[in-house]
Amino acid sequence: MADTYDLILKGGILVNHDGEGPLDLGIRAGRFAAIDDLSRASAGEVIDCKGLHLLPGVIDTQVHFREPGLTHKEDLESGSLSAVMGGVTAVFEMPNTDPLTVSAETLA
């Protein structure tokens, strides 16, 4: 019997620690359940990813959320949402604010 997933990302170029190549990604209950040729599997939804690269979550090691003091440029909400939309799952905040957020007292 074929496996069943909630979602299959089909035909993309998967990039991971082994390199890159055409593979499918099966997702079940919000988690990666299979990375393989899933042509015999079924899913509630299948997304054709041909011509797209599938990447693990990206870490952005230099962001400036500008909060406090410079939120007219960017704030935590807009910066975080932008990061998520770009596939970023973790950020390193660089304090470029007024006042500088470099101490526990300033962050309180």
Task: Please report, for each region that a protein language model flagged, where it lies by residue.
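Metal-associated gating/positioning segment near the N- to mid-region
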Residues: 52-108
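Histidine-rich, glycine-flanked metal-binding segment
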Residues: 2-57
